[in-house]
């Protein structure tokens, strides 16, 4: 399971010209599901995302997680993160989770974060989304479990 996280000052997701999810300070989480992923990996990754210290403390060091920084999550499904780009000029998605598997794990990820008290907004699974963000830093990390 893969989470590409970006520290943002604002981010939003639009579908059909309508904003369906938006946050101010926080993390934009692009979430990719691979074939071997399961609920155990989902929980491990969700905990890592929520605990990862990418926000600056009073000394300018990255010592605060999203909750400690008073931020929120915007979680967007992105199956292309599971692409194999090692050969040729076209990505292969043979390692990506099936749409049914990915939807279940995406929804579990969001529910898990919310159950832990994390303010969490979402995109729309499998929709054509327009994602806008202001990357703060820029700070971007690729987390995998």
From Swiss-Prot:
**Main localisation:** cytoplasm
Write out the GO MF terms: D-tyrosyl-tRNA(Tyr) deacylase activity; Gly-tRNA(Ala) deacylase activity; Ser(Gly)-tRNA(Ala) hydrolase activity; tRNA binding
Q: What is the top-level taxon of the source organism? A: Bacteria
Motif Gly-cisPro motif, important for rejection of L-amino acids, residue range(s) on this chain: 137-138
Q: Does the keyword Disulfide bond apply?
A: no
**Disulphide bridges, residue numbers:** none
Q: Which UniProt keywords apply?
A: Cytoplasm, Hydrolase, RNA-binding, tRNA-binding
EC class, as a word, reads hydrolase
Q: Name one Pfam family in it.
A: Tyr_Deacylase
Q: What is its EC number?
A: 3.1.1.96
Gene Ontology biological-process entries: D-amino acid catabolic process
The answer to keyword Hydrolase applying to this record is yes
Catalytic activity reported: glycyl-tRNA(Ala) + H2O = tRNA(Ala) + glycine + H(+); a D-aminoacyl-tRNA + H2O = a tRNA + a D-alpha-amino acid + H(+)
Q: Name residues in a coiled coil.
A: none
- GO CC terms, sorted: cytoplasm
- Subcellular location(s) per record: Cytoplasm
Subunit details for this protein?
A: Homodimer.
Domain topic, free-text comment = A Gly-cisPro motif from one monomer fits into the active site of the other monomer to allow specific chiral rejection of L-amino acids.
Name the family the entry cites: Belongs to the DTD family.
Function per UniProt:
An aminoacyl-tRNA editing enzyme that deacylates mischarged D-aminoacyl-tRNAs. Also deacylates mischarged glycyl-tRNA(Ala), protecting cells against glycine mischarging by AlaRS. Acts via tRNA-based rather than protein-based catalysis; rejects L-amino acids rather than detecting D-amino acids in the active site. By recycling D-aminoacyl-tRNA to D-amino acids and free tRNA molecules, this enzyme counteracts the toxicity associated with the formation of D-aminoacyl-tRNA entities in vivo and helps enforce protein L-homochirality.
Query: What is the recorded name of this protein?
Result: D-aminoacyl-tRNA deacylase
Origin organism lineage: Bacteria, Pseudomonadati, Pseudomonadota, Gammaproteobacteria, Alteromonadales
């Amino acid at each position: 399971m893969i989470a590409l996280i970006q520290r943002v000052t604002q981010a939003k997701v639009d579908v059909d010209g309508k904003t369906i999810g938006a946050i101010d300070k926080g993390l934009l989480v692009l979430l990719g599901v691979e074939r071997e992923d399961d609920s155990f990996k989902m929980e491990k990754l969700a905990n890592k995302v929520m605990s990862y210290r990418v926000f600056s403390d009073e000394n300018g060091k990255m010592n605060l997680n999203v909750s400690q920084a008073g931020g929120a999550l915007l979680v967007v499904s992105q199956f292309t993160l599971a692409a194999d780009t090692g050969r040729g000029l076209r990505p292969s998605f043979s390692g990506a989770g099936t749409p049914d598997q990915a939807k279940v794990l995406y929804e579990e990820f969001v529910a898990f974060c919310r159950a832990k008290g994390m303010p969490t907004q979402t995109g729309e699974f499998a929709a054509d989304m327009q994602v806008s963000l202001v990357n703060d830093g820029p700070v971007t990390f690729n987390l995998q479990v």
